[in-house]
Amino acid sequence: MITTKRLRLELSTLIGAAIALAGTSAVIGADEAAARALARQSNCFKCHSVDKKKDGPAWREVAAKYRDKPDAEATLTNHITSGEKVKFEDGHEEDHAIVKSKDPKEIRNLVDWILSLP
């Protein structure tokens, strides 16, 4: 029997693989308006902002940390689609919210936009 958590993990792995196989650079062609709309719809701005640390890191910090890593897109895609645990500064852990889209193109655009931030 497949559990919901296992199904989420398998789905996020498939989405990550599809995005990785698409093969274009993360910094080319991100649609900022669409990325921001998906982030807003998914309540990402509750914990993140572009420039300032909130409960989660600023996306510019995320971009700087992952931008030059070969697995950056797959890593971030997995992070926003799998519901993995995240640890907060006060030590408590929560499941990371899952982006509210199953469309690999929308998810990739959000990841590409984050990675494109200077």
What is the predicted function of each stretch?
Residues 55-66, 79-109:
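Axial heme c-ligation environment in periplasmic c-type cytochrome domains
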Residues 2-15:
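Bacterial N-terminal signal peptides that target proteins for export
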Residues 42-50, 110:
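The canonical Cys-X-X-Cys-His
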Residues 48, 81, 115-118:
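Protein kinase-like catalytic domain
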Residues 31, 35, 55, 72, ...:
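Stable alpha-helical elements in mature extracytoplasmic
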Residues 21-39, 65-69:
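Electrostatic cytochrome c docking/interface patches
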